[in-house]
Design a protein with these regions (language model features):
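Positively charged, low-complexity/disordered segments
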Residues: 1-10
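Glycoside hydrolase catalytic-domain context in secreted enzymes
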Residues: 9-403
């Protein structure tokens, strides 16, 4: 679906693949980066070819059928062989067997990890089928070395011609060749589309549909809007945390809510819904509150943002050291307050203790800028009937042990 949205449905028009409102999409990272041993970033995927195809390759088949024009090679290895230098996977499997006509792009200096290569030269990656090398720093040396490698026969000129043909084909299909200047294209400088209401409504819908209800003791959800609700937890009012890594910055850290104009935190969304329903909202990061006891506590917590190797784990246990979030849950539970856990994460984690301490537990993943999408589901409408029901399903198993 996302591929169709990016490239459109004009797949049969070979001389002009995309309409002016569409873009060239990239599928990545080919192949097996989600199956490395122990989940280590840029690690080694130790599986059979059948498992590699059946589990890690299916998404690429669908992407190719839907018109993806570029595919990025992965940093990881397959059974010890770096994919950037794997002729069988890139040339024979991807281009020949899977029929990929676009071009393969390397990842950030990924070629430098291939045996016998470095950041400044890698004939092996080019010969293996990488058509466009990503060289952020040593590009002048890489260019000169590649020319020399063609001249001395390390790289066949037919391989260069194939790479150039593939790149030009994508440019032609996207209308770049012979088309308008970038500054003259239909949507040039149309910044009003960024963060537009229409786009945000789609994002809000995506949040609603991706929520997975893992526990709902005594059918506590959905909550009525006219209650006294405590919203607490370290992520309750943090759009940055609910957006994760690769958000504004590489690691997604150091962001404040002010960096997300018009975005809504989980608290913002709940506050809007509860206030509209005649209820009372209390915000607290540590579970404390003043006044009468809340009718329910919504505790928002989870992973802090990370990207790439910074997210590597030695255990799947959430907060394997200090259980600060679990302590909040236990404190509220001891007071007899019903607890709804909103768990933010980019992956399944072992949270048995947190689930057991909660009356309801929701895997909310990373809802991004539209925290209000969570409130749409966990509260009734003004008629006190279901507003939006939970529809999200786990597409993979949830860990039963921390190892």
């Amino acid at each position: 679906a996302i591929m169709a949205g990016l490239v459109g449905s004009e797949m049969c028009i070979r001389d002009r693949l995309f309409s002016p409102s569409k873009v060239v999409a990239t599928a990545k990272h080919f192949i097996g980066d989600g199956g490395t041993t122990d989940g280590i970033d840029q690690g080694n995927t130790e599986v059979s070819e059948q498992e590699l195809r059946d589990i890690h390759g299916q998404g690429y088949m669908s992407a190719i059928e839907s018109g993806v024009q570029t595919i990025m090679a992965t940093f990881n290895s397959w059974n010890g062989s770096k994919v950037h230098g794997n002729n069988y996977l890139l040339n024979e499997v991807l281009k020949e067997q899977m029929g990929f006509e676009g071009f393969v792009i390397g990842d950030w200096t990924g070629h430098g990890q291939v045996n016998g290569c470095n950041d400044e030269q890698c004939a092996k990656a080019i010969n293996a089928g990488v058509d466009m090398i990503m060289v952020p720093f040593a590009w002048k040396a890489f260019f000169e070395n590649t020319v020399n490698q063609v001249e001395n026969g390390e790289i066949a000129i037919t391989r260069i011609n194939d790479a150039v043909k593939r790149i030009l084909r994508v440019k032609a299909r996207s209308g770049i060749i012979g088309g308008d200047l970038p500054s003259e294209r239909q949507y040039s400088n149309q910044t009003n589309f960024l963060g537009s209401e229409t786009h945000r409504l789609v994002a809000r819908e995506a949040v609603r549909k991706s929520l997975v209800l893992l526990k709902n003791k005594n059918s506590i959800l959905p909550l009525k809007r006219n209650q006294r609700i405590l919203v607490t937890g370290p992520a309750a009012n943090s759009i940055g945390q609910q957006s994760g890594g690769w958000t504004i910055t590489w690691q997604g850290t150091g962001n404040s809510n002010a960096d997300f104009p018009n975005g809504t935190s989980v608290y913002d969304g709940i506050s809007q819904v509860v206030s509209d329903g005649g209820g009372t909202i209390i915000l607290s990061t540590d579970g404390t509150y003043s006044g009468s006891r809340p009718d329910a506590a919504i505790v928002v917590y989870g992973e802090t943002p990370y990207a790439e190797g910074a997210g590597d784990l030695s255990s799947l246990e959430y907060q394997s050291g200090s259980k600060t979030d679990l302590n909040i849950l236990k404190s509220l539970k001891d007071q007899g307050i019903p607890i709804i856990s909103i768990f933010l994460s980019g992956r399944p984690l072992w949270v048995n203790a947190e689930i057991n301490a909660s009356d309801a537990f929701i895997a909310a993943w990373l809802p991004g800028s539209e925290g209000i999408g969570i409130a749409d589901v966990i509260f009734t409408n003004n008629e006190e009937t279901v507003n939006y029901d939970f529809s999200g399903k786990l597409s993979f198993s949830w860990p039963n042990t921390p190892t």
